[in-house]
A protein has these predicted regions:
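N-terminal secretory signal peptides
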Residues: 1-8, 33-34
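Active-site acidic/histidine proton-transfer and metal-coordination neighborhood
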Residues: 16-17, 21-24, 72, 107-200, ...
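C-terminal segment of N-terminal export signals and the immediately downstream linker at the start
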Residues: 28-67, 75
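Hydrophobic faces of well-ordered beta-strands that scaffold small-molecule active sites
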Residues: 56-61, 85-87, 115-120, 145-147, ...
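Conserved, mostly hydrophobic/aromatic
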Residues: 60, 77, 108, 137, ...
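Catalytic domains of carbohydrate-active enzymes, especially glycoside hydrolases
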Residues: 73-88, 140
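Gly/Pro-rich active-site loop or hairpin
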Residues: 74, 180, 184, 208-262, ...
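Glycine-rich, proline-tolerant flexible connector loops at the mouths of alpha/beta enzymes
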Residues: 86-103
Length: 295
């Protein structure tokens, strides 16, 4: 998933209003059983402590459903039994106007899906732009912003100020070979001398692409882990269904269990965007199998 900088709600308001009306009326007409292959939506249980995901807040990075309008994407998530969302800006753009916030909260409330994380968003030393993002996050109830901040002192000084003021976490997202935060050390060194609310969104697939160990990333970042994108890759370059690549899924979940991870555990599946649900079903089944091995 690419990083978004200064994404606003302009150009999305009309679509957002239509989507809100569709969810509230139940009229998501384009979402029909014929849209997906047999077996889709087989995982219907809620992710509660007694459910198939144990204590984990199993959710989805909405970029997985990027080819669907927001109302459709929320409906799919609900039918999959996923009640936590990390939204990418293409589904819910940043905006702080009270009417817009009310519309988004109504949309989310009607869907039964809770928006707990958001991103990926770029940051520099511009306080007005940063404040707009944090204001939006605070008003809509977001716990953590997945971020790709500049590495300079001014940017991190500003982020120290923002997380303290708003009580919203910054989770630095690693984005594979050549990115600013390619290696585990890049993130560890970036956060170590800053506010405890500045931490990491560990993207397991991108660490595999960078030939880094996602289990090690989780071990080293510990209580600085504010987000996880569960993604699988084979041979450092081929995106796969979760559980069919090189990711040590059980190992990752063991560390998350040990550190009492309480934030969204977001599946992010970037393949087959026009019909991802059958593959998502398999991904989620593999997560459930891995959790069952934790004891």
């Amino acid at each position: 998933m690419r990083e978004y900088r200064n994404v606003s709600r302009r150009g999305f308001l009309k679509a957002g209003a239509v989507a809100t009306a569709a969810v509230c009326s139940g009229a998501v007409s384009s979402l029909s059983p014929s849209s997906f292959s047999p077996g889709s939506f087989s995982l219907m249980a809620a992710d509660t402590a007694a459910g198939p995901y144990g204590s984990f807040k199993m959710g989805i990075q909405s970029y997985t459903l990027r080819d669907f309008k927001v109302a459709e994407a929320l409906e799919i998530s609900k039918k999959l039994g996923l009640h936590y969302w990390e939204s990418f800006p293409g589904h819910i753009p940043i905006g702080t106007v009270p009417k817009y916030i009310a519309e988004q909260n109504e949309l989310l409330g009607a869907s039964g899906v809770k928006l707990v994380a958001y991103g990926v968003v770029g940051f520099d030393g511009n306080e007005s732009k940063a404040r707009e993002v944090f204001e939006f996050a605070k008003k809509i109830g977001i716990e953590s912003i997945s971020a790709d901040p500049n590495k300079d002192e001014a940017t991190f000084k500003l982020l120290d100020k923002m997380v303290e003021e708003y009580g919203v976490n910054i989770a630095i997202h690693n984005h594979g070979p050549g990115a600013k935060y390619d290696k585990i050390d890049d993130v560890v060194n970036a956060v170590k001398d800053h506010n405890p609310r500045i931490g990491a969104c560990v993207d397991t697939g991108h660490y595999l692409r960078s030939k880094e160990n996602p289990v090690e990333a989780l071990e080293r970042l510990k209580d600085r882990v504010f987000g996880v994108h569960l993604k699988d890759v084979k041979d450092a370059k081929i995106f796969k269904i979760l559980g069919e690549g090189d990711l040590d899924l059980v190992g990752c979940l063991k560390i998350l269990q040990r550190i009492k991870y309480k934030y969204c555990l977001a599946l992010e599946y970037e393949e087959n965007p026009k019909n991802p649900v059958p593959d998502i079903d398999i991904c989620l089944a593999n997560v459930q199998k891995a959790i069952a091995k934790l004891g």
